[in-house]
């Protein structure tokens, strides 16, 4: 996908290879030099809860019309996204943002592109997506009743806790499963632990640029390469959001339900402003993580860039309209080195097989 300079200038921000130098971050009082970090050891979860959450994640009965599951937009075979620029959302609707990977959710400070949900509460993320009309459109009470009529789920539930299936705990189980999904065996992690042969010389040069000349590390740091903050880098609008009435309707409804003033006059994705109502947040989106980029194209909050080369070229020009970034002045070879480095942050594909939907069996409540 090609974009003229005005659009191209907007996109590297949501994906976030920012041009602010690391020294600027230090000057802002952040102390020691920022850097990426290897993935930490996985936290021990509740095995019974994770198993239930996996079942629910793949079960279409958690959507209003049985048409979609969590895995419909977060497919293990597609990097736990959907491979589309803009998500389809609930059947008969079209969504206005990209479906991000759920990998490494345990390390997110905030969830969703506008950062509206606390990263410490994955159960609320599951509830938000399952009950939202434009994603899965499920009533929590109906969901609870459906799942109670699946004997296999009732048995699994008893392994976890000695009570009946409960709506909020269903969401918590899905959240527990999501937070068990993590990047593993990325070449960069071995390199960061001392194996100098784990990544190529070109990728090592890209890492030096990432921390130095390009200044990407100012916003992309920590184990998943995200500071979890909101930034405006002028990512271009995806034309289909306004050209496709179904996507426009979804966007405007999101604004309306968020209480955004004058929402009917909006003709762009205002980002975090719809949540905060602070005009300084117009066009701001959460810094994307950099893990598993090999599997999660297209990129940015609206999927406007098909390749990492486009992303790097966009940021090299200083971002888009309204961006505070400066051009990176990277040569073609330096841009290629940066892309080579970014790919080292991807681990082995994490494939989880769909366990299938267990049969339902109407519950017997006793004699009439």
Curated annotation (Swiss-Prot):
Presence of keyword Cytoplasm: no
Predominant place of localization: periplasm
Subcellular localization(s) per the UniProt record: Periplasm
Pfam families: CCP_MauG
Inducing factors: Specifically expressed under iodate-respiring conditions.
Keywords annotated in UniProt: Heme, Iron, Metal-binding, Oxidoreductase, Periplasm, Repeat, Signal
Limits of the Cytochrome c domain: 48-158, 201-346
Gene Ontology molecular function: any one: metal ion binding
SUPFAM superfamilies associated with the record: Cytochrome c
Function comment: Involved in iodate respiration. Probably reduces the H(2)O(2) produced by IdrA/IdrB to H(2)O, using a reduced cytochrome c as the electron donor.
Signal peptide: 1-27
GO CC list: periplasmic space
InterPro entries: Cyt_c-like_dom, Cyt_c-like_dom_sf, Cytochrome_c_Peroxidase/MauG, Di-haem_cyt_c_peroxidsae, MauG/Cytc_peroxidase
Name the record gives this protein: Cytochrome-c peroxidase IdrP2
Gene3D superfamilies xrefs: Cytochrome c-like domain (1.10.760.10)
EC number, as in UniProt: 1.11.1.5
Subunit structure: The iodate reductase (Idr) complex is composed of a molybdopterin-dependent iodate reductase (IdrA and IdrB subunits) and two associated peroxidases (IdrP1 and IdrP2).
Catalytically driven reaction(s): 2 Fe(II)-[cytochrome c] + H2O2 + 2 H(+) = 2 Fe(III)-[cytochrome c] + 2 H2O
Residue sites binding heme c 1 per the record: 70, 73-74
Annotated gene: idrP2
């Amino acid at each position: 996908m090609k974009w003229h300079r005005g659009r191209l200038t907007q996109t590297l921000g949501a994906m976030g290879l920012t041009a602010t130098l690391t020294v600027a971050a230090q000057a802002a009082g952040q102390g020691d030099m920022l850097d990426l970090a290897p993935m930490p050891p996985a936290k021990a979860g509740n095995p019974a809860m994770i198993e239930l959450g996996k079942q629910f994640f793949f079960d279409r009965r958690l959507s209003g019309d049985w048409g979609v599951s969590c895995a419909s937009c977060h497919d293990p075979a597609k990097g736990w996204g959907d491979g589309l620029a803009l998500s389809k959302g609930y059947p008969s609707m079209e969504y206005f943002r990209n479906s991000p990977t759920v990998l490494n959710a345990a390390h997110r400070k905030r969830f969703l592109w506008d950062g509206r949900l606390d990263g410490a509460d994955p159960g609320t993320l599951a509830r938000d997506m399952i009950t939202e009309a434009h994603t899965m459109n499920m009533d929590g009470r109906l969901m609870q009743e459906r799942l109670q009529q699946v004997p296999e789920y009732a048995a699994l539930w008893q392994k976890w806790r000695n009570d009946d299936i409960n709506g909020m705990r269903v969401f918590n189980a899905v959240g527990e499963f999501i937070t068990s999904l993590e990047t593993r065996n990325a070449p960069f992690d071995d390199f960061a632990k001392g194996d100098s042969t784990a990544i190529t010389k070109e990728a090592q040069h890209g890492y030096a640029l990432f921390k130095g000349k390009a200044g990407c590390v100012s916003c992309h740091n920590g184990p998943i390469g995200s500071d979890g903050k909101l930034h405006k880098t002028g990512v271009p609008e995806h034309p289909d959001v306004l050209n496709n009435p179904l996507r426009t309707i979804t966007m405007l409804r999101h604004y309306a339900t968020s209480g955004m003033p004058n929402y009917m006059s909006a003709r762009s994705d205002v980002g975090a402003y719809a949540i905060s109502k602070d005009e300084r947040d117009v066009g701001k989106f959460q810094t994307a993580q950099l893990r598993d980029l090999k599997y999660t194209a297209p990129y940015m909050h609206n999927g406007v860039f098909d390749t990492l080369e486009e992303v790097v070229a966009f940021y090299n020009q200083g971002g888009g309209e309204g961006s505070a970034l400066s051009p990176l002045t990277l040569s073609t070879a330096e841009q290629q080195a940066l892309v080579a480095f970014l790919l080292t942050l991807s681990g082995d594909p994490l494939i989880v097989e769909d366990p299938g939907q267990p049969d339902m069996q109407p519950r017997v409540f006793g004699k009439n």
